[in-house]
């Protein structure tokens, strides 16, 4: 019976794919409730076995894919032998794909601070036998030290460096800058994915040397202006910093659009002034 109900839920859910209906809180709450009660323990994603978090926060048991446009983009932009950083690796959806794309001659560094997520990330990497992945249970930010990290009481993707109504508890966790962590790395870094709940600005400030030394580094980051502000980052300053060192921006809005289109700072700030209930991804690439 549980499988039949899940199948009905899955078909109903797919009707709304590409509509961004998930931006609404009541929809997210309903999905969390249904996912918690109906989801399987694991799913297969492109040949990879993935154990899910308690509420299937990425809806992988429903969609079989997460952020389709971004998933397709990384397949085009990441190549065999590349070095990739997954900042905010969660339970490993992108980490596993990166590991396959870079192959045995490449390397993936996956950063995930939250303990339960980290254990699932480790389990998913190990069960798929990816020995080209390095797992790091640290926060990536603009300083090294111990920081307070707030754990969401609703799902596994809403953990933040600032306190909100969603926070159920907090933990102390080690923070690092990418400049410090990779100061002795001899290979170039090719690609960074950042999804850290508004912490992208601080993480960027902590990788100034890395950005300088890796001229062709490509970045995908979450664009959530309100989260940046709550992390004491001015969204415009963050974009201008990247623009100053040669980056152009491309919008990945998660709807049914097929093209990833260039967008200016002015257009971004006008289109997503606060993004209180919605966020997108940005592809940042030097011309």
List each language-model region with its residue ranges.
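General small-molecule cofactor/ligand-binding pocket signal
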Residues: 51, 134-136, 250
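S-adenosyl-L-methionine
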Residues: 1-124, 128, 165-167, 181-185, ...
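Non-catalytic surface loops within mature trypsin-like serine protease
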Residues: 54-56, 142, 151-153, 223-225, ...
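Conserved acidic-Pro-Pro-aromatic motif
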Residues: 180-287
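Short internal loop-to-helix segment that lines adenine-nucleotide cofactor pockets
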Residues: 63-83, 130, 134, 143-151, ...
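A short, compositionally biased
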Residues: 34-39, 144-145, 243-246
